[in-house]
């Protein structure tokens, strides 16, 4: 058999020359080319060179591949598809999604790295059928993006799509698309031709390795001859290689909501097709050489790179003759005196110089509009009485501080502006704005209203499979019962091998499109010029089809509007103190050095305090003993994965306690590391070391920081190393072993340093929340309750902590409680929103119509149904009406027939004499109905029994000698297994006297996994570790606590 080589065919005559790769490159450049056709060659004919990796003797372009970003269809990441295509010697590739460009940027990046020519397109879910189109050029891409976006937004529902009829789709394309018409379109081919014209239609022949191929392709051949249409061959691969075909099949079965076994009649018999080379296809289909050749020809017509011109930010409407830059400078100049009032003359002078420098950098980089947009968002919050503050690297900027975007003053803190915005930066800055979570939606809707729905959208978040989800969906796809799938996902039983194998393939795969926590893009023209927009699950939210990284790659400018529960809680605290105490508190006028606040934190009395309430932080506070605001900055940064993994925590604490000498590898490091006792903690310190020791500019230092990020280029690192060593020598005469030591320390430190600017911003909230906890514990607790869900602790734990601080807890009653908790006279009145099954609207009607004199009166005037009256009865909320809970439940059914407009008293019924409830029954009912108890912490009811068992209460643990074996008991509040803990699990436990820390080894967890994972309350036997005001029990045995299931609704578990 003679080899088949693709050759030029000039006007239908054979010219005797094989197609060279340079010619092929010319084809793919987008120039008009002659057709390709296969011809036979003698064995001694010159074949194309095989020196190039993956080069094939038969050029072929796969123009209808898909990836895992075609959700619940494809099995391979776009990069894997590109790598496999390169390996097989393909000359061009199209990786497309259904109704979107979800994976387009990742495909473009991978193809650019591999040197693969790209063709862009999509599958469109038209009413007439699924239409596959390729874009001929960037204009075609833009049109396709707009069509998809319009179809997605037309429905008003996430996941839905509604395209116009085919003729209108064709009119929209205006000749800038190629339609790939497969077998499913043959009965409508006349209609398709009439709409799109023959020159824009290519028949798609299938090579799916199924018996249907031959018959279907025969029909396609007849149609091709009849209408003189071009045709191509495609394997339509949903998997890059054969190894992941079962995963693709499983995904498609899930999409059909049926197990693989039942879906087999609708799926490919092998799961799916996979990518193959031109050589393989020609061997399998020797009669389709012309179709293979046409793939290259069509790729030449349609190949282009995704170098889209991203929209700019909208031009700012500046007053008078001002430019954006002059208006920004004007705003800064009018606010600088106010923001720096009370600061020293030296700080003011340095700030003025720094601001001039920053404004110069902003002007040079062309970013004044960015700052004006952020300033406008902050001003909207301020005018709307919404608490907000910028955080992250923006806190390094004096301009941001003066504008009121951030509240950390960078000059006195010694923060480096270049960490935020370097003169060498090639993209816009990144300003995160924390907004009180309960009102963030107002800010988001303001953005939509101001800039228009077409020009503003939220950034997507691609939801990927994690361990539990992968296990569940693998089990579902394989047809196992839901109960078994849940048990395997929870780890309560071992899954079979087939589930484990498939779950491993699912893990990390994209599952569906979600929404970013707060990222929004704002443009001066429709976002759909670049990427389609669709509805999000949340009401009135629209989202682009790309995540934050894809948006950044494409040049879309993102603003992060992040919801922060503590800001909402603090706003409630401010309002409560103003309402009940008559005091208006200005957070920025608080004394940040109040000793009593720091005394409280030193005792680890920080339940509910922002950022320092976790188990690890509570263990660190007594050892760090914070006395200044900067100590809080360190505390925020210290207990992070980076410093923990980098080994900074214990050396710093030892030096802090005077147990270890403060030393430096070279005296020049004292300036940058002195404030953290010679232990590097912050990313800015890495930059400052480079400036002080090696003479780097601020911009160079930021380049060093970024180069040492997660994707380290060996070439770039080598160049920076050379520059660093030369700088050490020239600036400070540092050479040899000391230079090597400094470089190695910087390289290691870069992987774990935490931004000081971030810590500075958060430390303010640490202090504010601690200040409220010390001065106004009732308002503090109620603020946290009103902002739920948030933080580390459940409402029950927060209420118990307030009780331990002497605050009276008043129960829920229909006559005294509002919808939310309140803080009258320094006490806490629990709110109706805690009553399970009541609902917000019913709670609001109760608040609006109170007081009531009977259950029928309550039911009639608050318009309650039976279930709502029963919920109130179980919660004890009608005890104030002089009716016991059992009597109230008896009356509920009849009383609920009382409705507004009816004559009162018609439903009165006398309940029989019923026994009252015991204290334990009342407690258990309260926990079940509301999740909290007002009178006491549940463990108090069984304290006598605990003492008989020799159980040590939480408040006596610090009195126990280190190394003593003991038993403790309590409600499990948390389970946490940090990645930095080598598999150890930490339990948070609580009794009526306080909190306890328990450490469970890997072996003990495995031996008693069901109990450890599921018990609501436990007895723990173990060894107490007692040092520096911190007690931890290292468990060696877990026991169930009798009736423990009644003591709590469950724990809050974290990683």
UniProtKB/Swiss-Prot annotation:
Keyword Cell membrane: no
Ranges in a coiled coil: none
Cross-referenced Gene3D superfamilies: 1.10.150.870, Metal-dependent hydrolases (3.20.20.140)
Chief localisation class: cytoplasm
Entry keyword annotation includes Nucleotidyltransferase: yes
GO molecular function terms noted in the UniProt entry: 3'-5' exonuclease activity; DNA-directed DNA polymerase activity; nucleic acid binding
Compartments it resides in: Cytoplasm
Top EC group: transferase
Keyword terms of this UniProt record: Cytoplasm, DNA damage, DNA repair, DNA replication, DNA-directed DNA polymerase, Nucleotidyltransferase, Transferase
Catalysed reactions listed for this entry: DNA(n) + a 2'-deoxyribonucleoside 5'-triphosphate = DNA(n+1) + diphosphate
GO cellular component, one term: cytoplasm
Listed GO biological process terms: DNA repair; DNA replication; SOS response
This enzyme's EC code(s): 2.7.7.7
InterPro entries in the record: DNA_pol3_alpha_NTPase_dom, DNA_pol3_finger, DnaE2, DnaE2/DnaE/PolC, DNAPol_HHH, NA-bd_OB_tRNA, PHP_dom, Pol/His_phosphatase_N
Family: Belongs to the DNA polymerase type-C family. DnaE2 subfamily.
Listed HAMAP family: DNApol_error_prone
Cited function: DNA polymerase involved in damage-induced mutagenesis and translesion synthesis (TLS). It is not the major replicative DNA polymerase.
Record-given protein name: Error-prone DNA polymerase
Organism: Corynebacterium glutamicum (strain ATCC 13032 / DSM 20300 / JCM 1318 / BCRC 11384 / CCUG 27702 / LMG 3730 / NBRC 12168 / NCIMB 10025 / NRRL B-2784 / 534)
């Amino acid at each position: 058999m003679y080899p088949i080589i693709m050759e030029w065919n000039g006007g239908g005559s054979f010219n005797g020359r094989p197609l060279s790769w340079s010619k092929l490159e010319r084809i793919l450049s987008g120039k008009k080319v002659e057709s390709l056709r296969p011809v036979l060659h003698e064995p001694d004919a010159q074949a194309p060179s095989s020196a190039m990796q993956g080069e094939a003797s038969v050029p072929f372009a796969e123009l209808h591949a898909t990836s895992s970003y075609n959700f619940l269809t494809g099995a391979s990441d776009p990069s894997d598809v590109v790598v496999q295509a390169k390996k097989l010697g393909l000359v061009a590739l199209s990786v497309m999604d259904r109704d979107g460009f979800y994976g387009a940027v990742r495909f473009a990046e991978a193809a650019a790295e591999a040197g693969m020519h790209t063709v862009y397109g999509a599958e469109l879910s038209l009413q007439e059928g699924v239409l596959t189109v390729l874009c001929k050029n960037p204009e075609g891409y833009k049109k396709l993006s707009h069509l998809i976006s319009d179809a997605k937004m037309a429905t008003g529902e996430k996941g839905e799509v509604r395209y116009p009829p085919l003729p209108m789709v064709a009119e929209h394309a205006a000749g800038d698309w190629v339609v790939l018409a497969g077998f499913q379109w043959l009965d409508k081919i006349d209609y398709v031709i009439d709409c799109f014209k023959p020159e824009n239609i290519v028949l798609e022949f299938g090579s799916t390795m199924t018996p249907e191929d031959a018959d279907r392709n025969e029909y396609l051949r007849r149609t091709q001859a009849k209408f003189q249409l071009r045709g191509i061959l495609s394997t339509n691969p949903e998997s890059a290689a054969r190894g992941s075909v079962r995963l693709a099949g499983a995904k498609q079965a899930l999409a059909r909501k049926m197990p693989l076994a039942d879906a087999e009649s609708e799926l490919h018999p092998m799961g799916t097709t996979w990518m193959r080379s031109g050589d393989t296809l020609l061997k399998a289909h020797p009669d389709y050489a012309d179709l293979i050749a046409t793939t290259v020809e069509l790729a030449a017509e349609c190949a282009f790179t995704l170098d889209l011109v991203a929209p700019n930010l909208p031009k700012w409407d500046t007053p008078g003759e001002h430019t954006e830059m002059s208006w920004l400078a004007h705003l800064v100049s009018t606010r600088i005196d106010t923001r720096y009032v009370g600061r020293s003359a030296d700080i003011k002078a340095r700030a003025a110089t720094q601001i001039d420098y920053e404004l110069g950098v902003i002007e040079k980089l062309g970013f004044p509009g960015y700052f004006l947009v952020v300033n406008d968002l902050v001003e909207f919050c301020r005018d709307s009485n919404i608490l907000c503050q910028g955080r992250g690297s923006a806190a390094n900027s004096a301009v941001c501080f003066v504008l009121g975007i951030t509240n950390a003053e960078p000059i006195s803190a010694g923060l480096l502006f270049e960490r935020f915005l370097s003169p060498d930066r090639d993209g816009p800055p990144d300003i995160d704005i924390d907004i009180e979570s309960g009102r963030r939606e107002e800010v988001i809707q303001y953005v939509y209203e101001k800039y228009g729905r077409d020009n503003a959208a939220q950034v997507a978040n691609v939801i990927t499979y994690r361990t539990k989800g992968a296990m569940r969906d693998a089990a579902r796809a394989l047809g196992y019962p839901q109960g078994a799938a849940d048990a395997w996902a929870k780890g309560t039983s071992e899954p079979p091998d087939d589930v484990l194998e498939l779950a491993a393939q699912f893990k990390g795969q994209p599952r569906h499109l979600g929404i970013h926590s707060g990222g929004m893009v704002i443009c001066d023209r429709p976002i759909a010029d670049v990427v389609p927009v669709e509805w999000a699950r949340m009401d009135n939210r629209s989202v682009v089809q790309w995540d934050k990284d894809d948006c950044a790659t494409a040049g879309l400018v993102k603003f992060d509007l992040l919801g922060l529960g503590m800001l909402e809680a603090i706003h409630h605290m401010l309002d409560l103190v103003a309402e009940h105490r008559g005091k208006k508190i200005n957070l920025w006028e608080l004394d940040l050095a109040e000793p009593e606040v720091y005394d409280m934190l030193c005792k680890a009395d920080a339940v509910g305090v922002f950022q320092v309430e976790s188990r690890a932080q509570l263990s660190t506070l007594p050892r760090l003993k914070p006395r200044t605001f900067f100590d809080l900055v360190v505390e925020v940064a210290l207990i992070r994965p980076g410093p923990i993994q980098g080994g900074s925590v214990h050396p710093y604490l030892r030096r802090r306690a005077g147990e270890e000498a403060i030393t430096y590898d070279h005296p020049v490091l004292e300036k940058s590391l002195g404030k953290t006792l010679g232990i590097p903690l912050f990313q800015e310190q890495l930059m400052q070391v480079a400036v002080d020791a090696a003479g780097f500019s601020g911009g160079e230092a930021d380049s060093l920081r970024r180069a040492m990020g997660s994707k380290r280029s060996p070439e770039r690192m080598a160049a920076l190393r050379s520059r660093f060593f030369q700088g050490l020598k020239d600036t400070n005469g540092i050479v040899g072993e000391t230079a090597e030591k400094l470089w190695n320390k910087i390289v290691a430190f870069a992987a774990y340093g935490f931004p000081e600017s971030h810590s500075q911003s958060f430390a303010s909230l640490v202090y504010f929340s601690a200040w409220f906890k010390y001065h106004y514990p009732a308002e503090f607790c109620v603020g946290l309750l009103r902002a739920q869900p948030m933080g580390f602790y459940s409402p029950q734990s927060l209420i118990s902590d307030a009780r331990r601080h002497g605050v009276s807890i008043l129960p829920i009653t229909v006559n005294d409680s509002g919808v939310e908790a309140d803080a009258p006279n320094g006490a806490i009145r629990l709110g109706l929103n805690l009553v399970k099954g009541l609902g917000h609207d019913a709670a609001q009607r109760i608040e609006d119509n109170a007081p009531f004199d009977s259950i029928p009166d309550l039911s009639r005037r608050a318009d309650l149904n039976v279930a709502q009256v029963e919920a109130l009865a179980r919660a004890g909320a009608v005890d104030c009406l002089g009716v016991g809970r059992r009597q109230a439940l008896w009356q509920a059914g009849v009383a609920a027939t009382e409705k507004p407009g009816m004559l009162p008293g018609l439903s009165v019924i006398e309940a029989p004499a019923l026994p009252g409830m015991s204290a334990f029954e009342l407690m258990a009912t309260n926990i079940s109905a509301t999740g909290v108890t007002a009178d006491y912490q549940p463990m108090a009811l069984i304290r006598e029994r605990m003492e008989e068992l020799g159980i040590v209460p939480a408040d006596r643990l610090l009195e126990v000698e280190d190394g003593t074996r003991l038993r403790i008991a309590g409600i499990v509040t948390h389970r946490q297994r940090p990645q930095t803990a080598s598999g150890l699990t930490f339990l948070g436990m609580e009794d009526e006297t306080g909190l306890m820390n328990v450490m469970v080894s890997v072996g003990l967890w495995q031996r008693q996994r069901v109990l450890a994972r599921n018990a609501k309350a436990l007895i723990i036997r173990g060894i107490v570790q007692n040092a520096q005001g911190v007690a931890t029990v290292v468990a060696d045995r877990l026991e169930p606590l009798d009736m423990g299931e009644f003591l709590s609704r469950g724990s809050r578990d974290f990683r």
